[in-house]
């Protein structure tokens, strides 16, 4: 749209209601604004000293300047404060009522009133990312505004010209083609109607009233730069606190923020806990915070003026269908939720009844189905004047609270081993690990399930032998099959009942179906509110199995009578409940496996069942208190399955999330050093699609169980590179704030997504094969409407396509995935597109092909996306243009920054709440770092004691973490990393002189800083395994890996050099070393003893080595000062180590792991102490 389209304000004409009957209720807003001026004043707050000096010079020279004149003219507006007055009192009192509640600016042309709370806010940014009025509307979830009466447009309520909607986030303006008229219309449906063309309005020119999180300048002016400098300075954090205050006290002011206790935060979660009491005291308040937030959310969601459609279900129960208004609440309606329906009209007596939701809005309709518990006196003849209340149920929170208390006070709630490990008291080197001694199955697969691959067999074997185990299942690696096999083997080996849990009903149902295939006796326990909801495993549900029991005829008769009449007499009801309870106990005690949600495990019906083992699937999506509900049921064996490189739990309360409630138990145990067994063969994605996620998030360890031919669709679609079914379509559309005010949409991207989808449908792809992913709810809702109304094919086809958020697609897969990125702006950033876990999930949902639609110029500013975009560009699949004429984009990106962690690049971006957790220091315990440590002390302690020593700290390998002494100001000693045991002691450093200053900063094992770089120098903690580090499977032939041959050759050459030269330490070392090596590559330094496994143990005067235990698998490391060391022999975080240095790396006990070397890229330390990477020609 040209800026010259409009005439000056004097030439504007306006529609008159009496003269214009094109649209009923039409109205326009008069304006005095010159529409040729589309410039926006600067929002910078800073004024340099040079500007101030220039003004001073002009004042002394008598130079008159318009800017200077404006400053002097505005001096009268300045508020000065007498010393005797109360601070800030005179300023507040003298402000007019229409002053901005944030900053105090009160120019009528720059302020807007919120119609919901009647407060005024300005259109200036201050120090925030958006204007103050937009900040308020978003945070308070208000939507309507009125302009000031003394402003250019007068006192005007902003509303749609056609339908009268007043939500400013959906309003925009359209210029008429013939007349200089500005018409306000909502985005959908009014601006999208074809009838606009008949009104001489150009609907293609529709623009939102809000751009860059400010109202357009011609609508509401922005305060001058001087005005913003003189105004009260308020930060985004203060705005948040003020908005929270207003929810409790509408009259609260800025001064109330200074009161004590306003910004109190709950105690942060810890990494380790002293005992169960401290554990409960930490998580209990967080659970209560989340419960209070959830209660407020639901109780404030009452909706009025509801129209109802009545129906009767197959079970003869009354069902009310109605449509809820599109709210901006964070609450999502789910099956089984309880609502209360009120009749408040005059045609019938007042009535209310509770029901549970049996239908939720979807692509086919917005109706909500509510099955009433009782239809007595229901006003079925009335269809209007109804109100809906959301009923808050505290069941889940109560169960979490009880589980935390039980964990603290009941010794029988968990075994001693699991109790100590959950508190973080276990040793990081696993030397105190308990193994179950007993027969192992000869065949690890389960009947009627696919045969397991090698990594799956190792995971099953590992889980069966240990009381606590973690299994990491990357996308498409058969996590559910592996879990079902573990459950089958547990039942066959140990007997008893196994409890299987997951955070969501969908995940539980999927796992239940797989376990049922193995012919085990499975019972699915679900909440009573969900008993009427159908699912693929409904026949296994406890209530349905009771109905089908042939043994109890009396119960069957009473059940039939209750179904027919709806209720029983009090005597019959009591008898019915007793018989049903007895039948439930009988079924549960006879079951091999009981499946339920994590919270469902707190059901009283399960309290009497003795569980031998517990398996929690998708444990990464559960909060820690949620996981504790099944854990405290007394089992001796716990298996957690998940993937902490994917999305974690959802916590609604931001305070609780900041305090660490959003951290899962799985992730904390990983940080504590319990290494997960990773499944490593993916069967979902085309090999080209798996390459980036594998190398970026999983250290290149994912193998392809399918070949390209298995994942090739035979259809007519213009892939830029036919052998690579993927591309990134460059789209330059601008983002807009969605109707909620808290989300975003991009109309240009939506149009491109529709064209791509239509092309696939015309090529023969079925709608259910396509999935459309977008990170933003606003874009999801817009896409649903856009494709149904604007799509060129029948709307029914588009309705059958699943359009969902990234979070909703976790655990799902589709043949074709189309992703809309949405974000496209100059200054606001890319929001949670920056989350590496969210990107990982989005990239790993597709089986046959993926298409990403977005603005690469904006996305490439973020390092994570820069890697992905360069990956696509290198493969010539970064394209632009129409589908029929796709051409390689000429956009050039900044070269990706070289990451220290080139082996596990994704972990560079992974951040966790635990990164800031402080470990509890129990006086006198094995974690107490306040005292010195003896030579033989087996501890997880620091090894940075200063002075001249050699690996003599209290570490997990006898004396020093990882078998080496951390260098201090005068010691660069024992840098053996536990591989071959170069634990040289004392004296000068390895270079024969004073230790370099960078050594302490780069080479010590900083257990907290490895997650968050800014904390790198702050902590000397005891987290032996970084979040991104996991077990690799041993003895898998190199041919299975899609690694560059250059990498393999480099490792082979490196090993040959090591074997020829051996390990040595130049300079004056200590009196001897104690080390662990393999064969003759062990470091000399004392008497050599060779055990039966062919490993050698060297003993001598040194103190930095690690005793070799059977089952350990150690690679020999070359001295860093002589030869490049494989990166996997160092920590794959900014400072650290590789897993192969730990005992138990080899899961095939007694054999040597080769995988670290095969997957590594060579790295060496340069003269300045930084890692220098010898990158290969194709790093991906």
From Swiss-Prot:
Which Pfam families does the record cross-reference, listed alphabetically? AAA_11 (PF13086), AAA_12 (PF13087), ResIII (PF04851), UPF1_1B_dom (PF18141), UPF1_Zn_bind (PF09416)
Residues binding Zn(2+) 1: 100, 103, 122, 132
| Source taxon at top rank | Eukaryota
Q: Which GO terms describe its molecular function?
A: ATP binding; ATP hydrolysis activity; DNA binding; double-stranded DNA helicase activity; RNA binding; RNA helicase activity; zinc ion binding
The region called CC/SHH/C is annotated at 114-142
Q: Which InterPro entries match?
A: DNA2/NAM7-like, DNA2/NAM7-like_C, DNA2/NAM7_AAA_11, Helicase/UvrB_N, P-loop_NTPase, SF1_C_Upf1, UPF1_1B_dom, UPF1_CH/ZBD
Tell me the residue numbers annotated for binding Zn(2+) 3. Answer: 160, 163, 186, 190
Q: Check the record and name the PROSITE patterns matching this protein.
A: UPF1_CH_RICH (PS51997)
Q: Where do the segments described as C4 lie?
A: 160-190
Q: Where in the cell is it found?
A: Cytoplasm; Cytoplasm, Cytoplasmic ribonucleoprotein granule
Q: Which CDD domains match?
A: 1B_UPF1-like, DEXXQc_UPF1, SF1_C_Upf1, ZBD_UPF1-like
**The EC number(s) this enzyme carries:** 3.6.4.12, 3.6.4.13
Q: Which SUPFAM superfamilies match?
A: P-loop containing nucleoside triphosphate hydrolases (SSF52540)
Q: Name one GO cellular component term.
A: cytoplasm
Keyword Nucleotide-binding recorded: yes
The positions annotated for binding Zn(2+) 2 are 114, 117, 136, 142
Known catalysed reaction(s)? Answer: ATP + H2O = ADP + phosphate + H(+)
Keyword Coiled coil recorded:
no
Modification after translation is described as:
Phosphorylated, probably by nonC.
Keywords, in A-Z order: ATP-binding, Cytoplasm, Helicase, Hydrolase, Metal-binding, Nucleotide-binding, Phosphoprotein, Zinc, Zinc-finger
> What positions does the domain Upf1 CH-rich occupy?
92-249
Q: Where does ATP bind?
A: 456, 473-480, 646, 683, 813
- Primary location recorded for the protein, binned into one broad class: cytoplasm
Q: What else is known?
A: In Drosophila, the definition of premature stop codons in mRNAs appears to be independent of exon boundaries and of the EJC complex.
Question: Can you tell me which family this protein belongs to?
Answer: Belongs to the DNA2/NAM7 helicase family.
Q: What is this protein called?
A: Regulator of nonsense transcripts 1 homolog
Q: What is the lineage of its organism?
A: Eukaryota, Metazoa, Ecdysozoa, Arthropoda, Hexapoda
């Amino acid at each position: 749209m040209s800026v010259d389209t409009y005439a000056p304000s004097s030439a504007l004409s306006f529609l008159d209601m009496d003269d214009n009957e094109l649209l009923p209720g039409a109205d326009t807003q008069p304006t005095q604004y010159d529409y040729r001026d589309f410039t926006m004043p600067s929002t910078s707050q800073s004024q340099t000293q040079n500007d101030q000096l220039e003004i001073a010079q002009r004042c002394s020279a008598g130079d008159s300047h318009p800017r200077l004149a404006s400053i002097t003219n505005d001096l009268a507006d300045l508020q000065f404060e007498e010393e005797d007055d109360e601070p800030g009192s005179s300023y507040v009192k003298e402000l007019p009522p229409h002053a901005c509640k944030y900053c105090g600016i009160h120019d009528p042309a720059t302020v807007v009133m919120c119609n919901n709370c009647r407060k005024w806010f300005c259109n200036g940014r201050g120090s925030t990312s958006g204007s103050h009025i937009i900040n308020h509307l978003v945070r308070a979830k208000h939507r309507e505004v009125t302009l000031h009466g003394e402003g250019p447009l007068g006192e005007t309520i902003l509303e749609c010209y056609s339908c009268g909607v007043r939500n400013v986030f959906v309003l925009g303006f359209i210029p008429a083609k013939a007349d200089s008229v500005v018409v306000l219309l909502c985005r959908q449906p009014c601006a999208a109607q074809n009838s606009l063309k008949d009104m001489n309005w150009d609907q293609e020119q529709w623009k939102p009233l809000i751009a860059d999180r400010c109202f357009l300048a011609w609508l509401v002016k922005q305060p001058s730069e001087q005005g913003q400098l003189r105004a009260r300075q308020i930060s985004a954090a203060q705005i948040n606190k003020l908005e929270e205050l207003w929810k409790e006290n509408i009259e609260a002011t800025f001064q109330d923020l200074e009161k004590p206790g306003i910004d109190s935060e709950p105690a942060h979660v810890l990494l380790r806990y002293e005992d169960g009491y401290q554990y409960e005291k930490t998580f209990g308040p967080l659970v209560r915070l989340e419960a209070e937030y959830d209660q407020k959310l639901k109780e404030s969601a009452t909706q009025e003026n509801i129209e109802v459609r009545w129906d009767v279900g197959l079970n003869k129960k009354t069902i009310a269908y109605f449509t809820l208004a599109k709210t901006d609440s964070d609450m999502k309606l789910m099956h089984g939720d309880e609502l209360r329906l009120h009749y408040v009209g005059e045609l019938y007596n007042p009535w209310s009844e509770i029901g549970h939701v049996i239908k939720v809005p979807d692509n086919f309709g917005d109706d909500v189905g509510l099955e009433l518990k009782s239809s007595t006196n229901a006003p079925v003849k009335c269809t209007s004047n109804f109100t809906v209340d959301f009923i808050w149920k505290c069941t889940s929170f109560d169960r979490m609270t009880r589980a935390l208390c039980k964990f603290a006070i009941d010794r029988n709630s968990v075994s001693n081993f699991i109790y100590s490990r959950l508190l973080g008291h276990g040793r990081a080197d696993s030397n105190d690990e308990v193994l179950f001694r007993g027969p192992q199955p000869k065949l690890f697969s389960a009947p009627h399930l696919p045969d397991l691959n090698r990594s799956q067999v190792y995971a099953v074997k590992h889980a069966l032998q240990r009381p606590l185990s973690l299994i990491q299942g990357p996308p498409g690696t058969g996590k559910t099959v592996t879990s079902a096999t573990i459950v089958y083997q547990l039942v066959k080996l140990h007997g008893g009942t196994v409890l299987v849990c997951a955070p969501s009903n969908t995940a539980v149902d999927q796992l239940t179906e797989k376990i049922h295939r193995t012919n085990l006796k499975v019972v699915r326990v679900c909440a009573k509110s969900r008993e009427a909801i159908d699912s693929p495993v409904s026949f296994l549900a406890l209530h349905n199995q009771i109905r089908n029991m042939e043994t109890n005829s009396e119960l069957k008769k009473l059940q039939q009578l209750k179904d027919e009449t709806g209720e029983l007499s009090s005597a019959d009801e009591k008898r019915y409940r007793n018989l049903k309870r007895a039948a439930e106990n009988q079924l549960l005690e006879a079951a091999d496996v009981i499946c339920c949600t994590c919270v469902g495990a707190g059901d009283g019906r399960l309290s009497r069942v003795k569980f031998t083992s517990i398996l929690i699937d998708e444990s990464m999506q559960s909060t820690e208190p949620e996981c504790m509900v099944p854990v405290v049921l007394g089992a001796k064996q716990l298996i957690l399955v998940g993937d902490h490189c994917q999305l974690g739990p959802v916590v609604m309360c931001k305070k609780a999330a900041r305090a660490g409630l959003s951290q899962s138990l799985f992730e904390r145990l990983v940080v504590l050093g319990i290494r997960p067994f990773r499944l490593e063969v993916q069967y979902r994605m085309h090999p080209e699609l798996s390459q980036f996620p594998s190398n970026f998030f999983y250290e290149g360890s994912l193998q392809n169980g399918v070949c390209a031919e298995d994942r090739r669709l035979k259809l007519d679609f213009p892939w830029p590179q036919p052998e690579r079914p993927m591309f990134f379509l460059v789209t330059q559309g601008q983002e807009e704030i969605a109707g909620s005010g808290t989300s975003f949409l991009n109309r240009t991207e939506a149009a491109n997504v529709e064209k791509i989808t239509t092309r696939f449908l015309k090529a023969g792809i079925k709608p259910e094969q396509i999935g459309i992913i977008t990170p933003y709810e606003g874009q999801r809702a817009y896409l649903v409407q856009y494709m149904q109304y604007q799509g060129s094919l029948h709307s029914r086809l588009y309705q059958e396509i699943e359009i969902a958020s990234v979070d909703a697609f976790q655990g799902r897969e589709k043949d074709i995935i189309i992703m809309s990125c949405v974000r496209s702006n100059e200054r606001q950033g890319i929001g949670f597109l920056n989350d590496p876990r969210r990107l990982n999930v989005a990239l790993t949902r597709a089986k046959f092909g993926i298409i990403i639609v977005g603005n690469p110029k904006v996305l490439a500013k973020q390092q994570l996306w820069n890697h992905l975009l360069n990956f696509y560009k290198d493969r010539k699949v970064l394209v632009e243009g129409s589908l029929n004429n796709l051409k390689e984009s000429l956009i050039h990106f900044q070269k990706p920054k070289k990451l220290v962690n080139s082996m596990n690049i994704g972990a560079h971006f992974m951040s966790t709440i635990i990164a800031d957790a402080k470990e509890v220091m129990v006086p006198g315990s094995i974690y107490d770092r306040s005292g010195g440590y003896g030579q033989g002390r087996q501890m997880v302690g620091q090894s940075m004691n200063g002075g001249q020593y050699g690996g003599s700290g209290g570490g997990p390998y006898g004396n020093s973490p990882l078998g080496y002494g951390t260098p201090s100001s005068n010691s660069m000693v024992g840098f053996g990393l536990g591989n071959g045991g170069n634990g040289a002691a004392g004296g000068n450093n390895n270079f024969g002189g004073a230790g370099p200053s960078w050594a302490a900063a780069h080479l010590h094992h900083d257990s907290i800083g490895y997650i968050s770089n800014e904390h790198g120098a702050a902590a000397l903690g005891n987290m032996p395994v970084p979040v991104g580090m996991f077990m690799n499977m041993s003895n898998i032939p190199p041919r299975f890996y899609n690694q560059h041959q250059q990498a393999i050759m480099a490792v082979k050459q490196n090993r040959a050099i090591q074997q020829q030269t051996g390990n040595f330490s130049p300079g004056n070392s200590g009196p001897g070393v104690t080390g662990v090596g393999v064969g003759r590559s062990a470091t000399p330094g004392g008497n050599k003893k060779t055990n039966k496994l062919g490993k050698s143990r060297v003993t001598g005067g040194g103190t930095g080595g690690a005793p070799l235990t059977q089952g350990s698998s150690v690679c020999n490391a070359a001295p860093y000062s002589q030869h490049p060391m494989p990166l996997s022999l160092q920590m794959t975080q900014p400072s650290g180590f590789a897993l192969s240095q730990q005992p138990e790396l080899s899961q095939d006990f007694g054999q040597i792991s080769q995988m670290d070397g095969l997957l590594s890229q060579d790295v060496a330390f340069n003269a300045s102490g930084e890692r220098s990477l010898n990158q290969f020609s194709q790093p991906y």
